[in-house]
């Protein structure tokens, strides 16, 4: 038995592209009217800094879907040192020199666009 091969499903390229675009659009809708200060949350064991979380999810999209599968170079220099949850302890995430909210959202859009482009190219 090969779990990753035996249990799978198939989606069309168009469906995958729409899912990626929908996730990005929903995220942007949720944060569009927030001010920079509203992205800051107190240090709690159950949550991550919100701005860090946006960058982290984007970093994993980039790392797994673009860098590893597509052998592309990082779009954000140093992203691994900021957003890799395998390397960065939970409490340390609050003191990282993260990009601004606007820069984080721009990074998210660049990665989303590149993922869509990669999907449409296959």
Place the predicted regions along the sequence by residue.
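Short, helix-capping/interhelical loops that line the mouth of catalytic, cofactor-
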Residues: 1-15, 63-118
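N-terminal regions that are enriched for targeting/export leaders
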Residues: 1-39
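Helix-loop segments that flank and shape redox-cofactor active sites
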Residues: 25-49, 67-74, 117-122
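Ligand-binding pocket scaffold of soluble enzyme catalytic domains
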Residues: 57
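Short Ser/Thr-interspersed hydrophobic loop/turn segments at strand-loop and sheet-helix junctions
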Residues: 60
């Amino acid at each position: 038995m090969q779990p990753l091969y035996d249990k799978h499903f198939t989606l069309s390229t168009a469906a995958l592209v729409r899912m990626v675009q929908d996730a990005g659009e929903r995220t942007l809708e949720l944060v569009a009217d927030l001010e920079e200060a509203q992205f800051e949350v107190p240090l709690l064991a159950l949550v991550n800094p919100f701005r860090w979380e946006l960058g982290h999810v984007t970093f994993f999209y980039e790392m797994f879907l673009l860098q590893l599968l597509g052998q592309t170079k990082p779009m954000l220099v140093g992203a691994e040192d900021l957003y890799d949850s395998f390397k960065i302890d939970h409490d340390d995430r609050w003191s990282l020199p993260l990009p601004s909210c606007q820069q984080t959202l721009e990074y998210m859009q660049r990665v989303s666009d590149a993922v869509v482009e990669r999907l449409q190219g296959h």
